[in-house]
A protein has these predicted regions:
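Short, well-ordered beta-strand elements
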Residues: 31-44, 95-99, 120, 147-149, ...
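Short, solvent-exposed loop/turn elements at domain surfaces
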Residues: 31, 43-54, 79-81, 157-160, ...
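Surface-exposed binding/hinge segments that line
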Residues: 89-93, 97, 132-173, 187, ...
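Gly/Pro-rich hinge or "lid" segments in bacterial periplasmic/extracellular proteins
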Residues: 161-211, 215, 225
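Short, low-complexity disordered leader/linker segments with a strong preference
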Residues: 1-35, 79, 123
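Aromatic- and charge-enriched surface segment that lines or borders ligand/interaction sites
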Residues: 86-128
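N-terminal lobe/hinge region of extracytoplasmic solute-binding protein
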Residues: 38-91, 183-184
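Short, hydrophobic alpha-helical packing/hinge segments within bilobed ligand-binding/sensory domains
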Residues: 120, 226-227
Length: 227
């Protein structure tokens, strides 16, 4: 329950930033709107200090701070709904065919395609044990704006697993070696990142519409009493 609550709070934060509703958003000297956010939920101790969703729990930061998005996400009733995907069809008990949106680009400028999703998920299961154990992938094939995933076992919960923050789709052509260069499909781009601070700038080409908050500064606060 706590995990689902954290996911909900992360999506709420992104929604506030998209709509320019952050409680501490204010213009800086350059006239940009800046949202400064202190949190106890980011840092080395949380295993989420970074933006590589294929490592530990960093996917929570990728999603929460608007850098990446998943193929599906949970609604308020905890039912998976399409996000970067438009729908899915189970071909059999082991296999699901997912159709992708055709109007999405990564912040790198590369287009979101079935091949891009395939490359991302293949890297995910190579490097992320929990994802590999959840998804139990036997194969992934891509064709245009579709990707077909076959599991080694019956996979009734496969779509639910793809809602997990580790499932943020990133541009593997940009790689994952440098957190600042990680390219997702979200409304924000990493400008700088340390274990205690993230500086994000808005993605001017975000597929979901105009991003109203120009810059976000996230600072880790080790003592909750100082919030």
């Amino acid at each position: 329950m706590m995990k689902l609550s954290l996911l909900g709070s992360g999506l709420l934060l992104t929604a506030l930033l998209l709509n320019g509703c952050g409680p501490s958003a204010a213009p800086d000297k350059a006239g940009e709107s800046v949202f400064r956010y202190g949190t106890t939920a980011y840092g080395v101790a949380m295993e989420n200090a970074g933006m590589d969703p294929h490592e530990s729990y960093k996917g929570w930061s990728t999603l929460r701070y608007g850098v990446g998005e998943t193929l599906f996400r949970f609604n308020e009733a905890m039912q998976p709904q399409p996000w970067l995907a438009t729908g899915y069809e189970f071909l059999d008990d082991h296999t699901v065919k997912i159709t992708l949106r055709d109007d999405v680009n990564f912040s790198s400028g590369a287009r979101l395609t079935g091949a891009a999703v395939k490359a991302c998920l293949e890297d995910l299961v190579k490097r992320h044990k929990r994802a590999a154990d959840d998804l139990k992938l036997a194969s992934i094939t891509a064709d245009g704006q579709t990707v077909t995933i076959k599991s080694q076992e019956k996979a009734p919960a496969l779509i639910n697993y793809l809602c997990d923050p580790y499932g943020c789709i990133i541009d593997m052509q940009r790689g994952t070696a440098d957190d600042v260069k990680i390219s997702g499909t979200g409304p924000y781009i990493v400008q700088s990142l340390t274990p205690t601070e993230i500086v994000l700038t808005k993605n001017p080409a975000y597929w979901g519409g105009r991003v109203k908050t120009d810059k976000v500064i996230v600072r880790s606060i080790p003592d909750g009493d100082t919030l």
